[in-house]
Structure formats: structure tokens, C-alpha cells
Amino acid sequence: MELAGGTDARIVVIPTAASQDHFPEDWSGLAPLIQAGAEDIQILHTRDRRKADTEAFAAPLAEATGVWIPGGRQWRLVDAYLDTRVHQALFELLERDGVVGGTSAGASILASYLVRGDPETNQVMVSPEYQVGFGLLSKTAVDQHLLARGREDDLWEVLDANPDLLGIGLDEGTALVVRQDHAEVIGVSQALFYDATEPPRYARSFASGAIYDLGTRTPVATAADEDASEEDRDGIQLGTRP
């Protein structure tokens, strides 16, 4: 809400990852945004990608200052919106300094590589037919519910086959605020970053307040780091791979 303009924010919610086909104006999924002060919210939803590729359907995004994508199954978002006018409008929103955010499936879809895209189960990391996300975060794969569901090692399967990708794992109650290449961790738990480009491969965990450079794949020193130990500054190394 703050990034989208506070009480002046114009929010478009895209709930298509969920299983239901209809989302009324009083849909309960809007409650967190309303509680955060949102006064101008529109729901944008379709299962028809031809409709999603029309200017008329995507028009609310042209006026939006923020987009929020709730959870569900990410393959539904691919089927409805990948390479459509809606997808293009998300990039245009960022170009005019708007914000696009999401939770669970709505977080994973923002990456260039799509994890857990299999329509049958969310336990499969790599689905042959669903490997492409929206790409707002280039050269990345984003997993979620990481520590809460014991998924700390799951991203290695993706990175073993695609070592150029940066793996990002988000625990519940935790998010990244990304500006250009800098990703700031906020929330109550951890964000993990996985790098398989050079041995030894590693995953590093960072708590709220840490900033990670997605381009150089290194932590960014902050004022709070001056009194921290070297281990705290560099993050906690997890799951090093040979």
C-alpha cells in the first residue's frame, strides 16, 4: 500500500490463481488490503486468455498504481495471462514507478522461471509444460512457504538444471521489496538466496532489514551492519552443495 501511494493508491487485484470462477466486490481476499487502508480496489479476473489480450479488459491496469496477485496455483495465471495484454501492462506499470506484488503463487509467478507449475500437484518443482513465469524478476526462480513447509532444499532441483538462475526462497510472513537490483527483506522470518553459478554452491538466509543485490548476488552493507558480526553481515550459509 505504501509503495502504491498509500490511501491514494489505485489497486488492481488479480485473483486468478484461486480455484473459484467468480470474485464478488466483497470477496474476502480483499480484506488485508482494505485493512491496510486501500480505498480504490478493482478485481481483474478471467480464464479466457483471448479476453485477457484485449485493451478493454486490461484497461484498469493503465490507471493502477499497484497490482496485487494472491495465492492459489500459478499455472492458472500462466494459462490466463502469459504473453497477453495483461502481462504487458504489468511491465508498463513498473515503468511508470508502480508496484506489482504477490503472495504464494502470486510471488512465484513474478519470476522468469516458474516453480511448482504442475497442474496436478504443487509438490513437483519442474513441470515440462509450465516453466515460464511473468519475468518481472529476470533470471530468477521464486519459491514460497519455504521454512514453514520444509522446502529449504527444493530449489536445488531447478538450479541443477538451470545454474544461471538465482534462486529466491521466501518464508511465510516475509517479503522482498525490490527496487532495481536491490531486494530488501521485510517481515518476521527469512528470505533465502541460492547461487549455483560457481562452486561451492550455497544458500544464504537473511532476516528483515538485510539488502541483497540480485545482479551481483551479494549482500549490500547497511548502517546496521557496522555493529554486526561477519556471519550476520554475510547471511547464514545453508545447504552448501559440492
Where are these regions (language model features)?
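A short helix-to-beta-strand connector/capping loop
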Residues: 37-40, 96, 163
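Portal/gating segments that form or line small-molecule/metal binding sites
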Residues: 12, 18-63, 69, 76
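Class I SAM-dependent methyltransferase SAM-binding "motif I" and its flanking Rossmann-like core
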Residues: 70, 76-149
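Mature, structured domains of secreted/extracytosolic soluble proteins
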Residues: 54-66, 75-96, 208-227, 231-238, ...
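C-terminal and late-domain segments of enzyme folds
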Residues: 1-7, 17-27, 32-35, 115-242
